[in-house]
Design a protein with these regions (language model features):
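Polytopic transmembrane helical bundles with strong interfacial aromatic enrichment
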Residues: 1-205
Length: 206
């Protein structure tokens, strides 16, 4: 990200998309990180977090809107990377503003023989789960420089969202396996979905 910011006029801006100054491009990027975290953190602290279906649906909708919006501001490559920066920033903030502080609070309460707040443990667990399921998508985005046919595809934002869903399904299989629950059908589903997506991209490539 530092390299992109340092060469923002070349690596971030695509005048065919939007004619931005280097300063404006950096400002938009940093603003997207802050706003995305505030929105995500607010949702996690709301009652929506108690309804997995509504929470996941809202997060997927926001992922789609953010991905689409970024492709209308930055060049395709940095737009892709920006989604990874946003998710990575949220993961980092989860660890240092929620997970670690809450765990330290619980430890301190235990040392003082005080009853600790169970909501702190639950919040830390939820954020940890979010980070866990985001891992594969972030890794994919980190390597996206090798997939120019995806990065510069007309529907790159939609492809990214679909890969996010597929990668989360794959991650779910490995999470279950870590608990000695073997559900190969989940892994097969993610693999088949990935093959179907790849086939569609190949057929309808730019």
């Amino acid at each position: 990200a530092v390299l992109y910011y340092y060469n923002s006029g070349v690596l971030m801006v695509d005048k065919r998309v939007l004619d931005l100054s280097p300063f404006a491009a950096i400002s938009y990027s940093l603003l997207s990180l802050v706003i995305s975290w505030v929105i995500y953190d607010t949702i996690c602290k709301s009652k929506l977090i108690n309804n997995n279906f509504l929470f996941l649906t809202l997060i997927l909708v926001l992922l789609g809107l953010v991905s689409f919006g970024l492709t209308k501001i930055f060049g395709a490559k940095f737009a892709f990377l920006s989604v990874g920066l946003i998710i990575g920033t949220n993961m980092f903030a989860n660890v240092f503003t929620v997970i670690i502080p809450n765990q330290m609070n619980i430890i301190d309460s235990a040392k003082k023989d005080q009853k600790f707040d169970m909501t702190l443990s639950l919040a830390a667990k939820q954020r940890s789960i979010h980070n866990n399921y985001s891992t594969f998508l972030v890794l994919f985005i980190m390597l996206s420089g090798h997939y120019s046919f995806l990065v510069y595809h007309k529907y790159n934002w939609l492809i990214l969202c679909l890969i996010g869903i597929i990668s989360a399904i794959g991650r779910h299989y490995f999470n279950l396996r870590g608990r000695n629950i073997n559900r190969p059908s989940i892994l097969f589903t993610s693999i088949i979905a990935l093959i179907i997506l790849a086939s569609i991209i190949f057929i309808f490539k730019n």
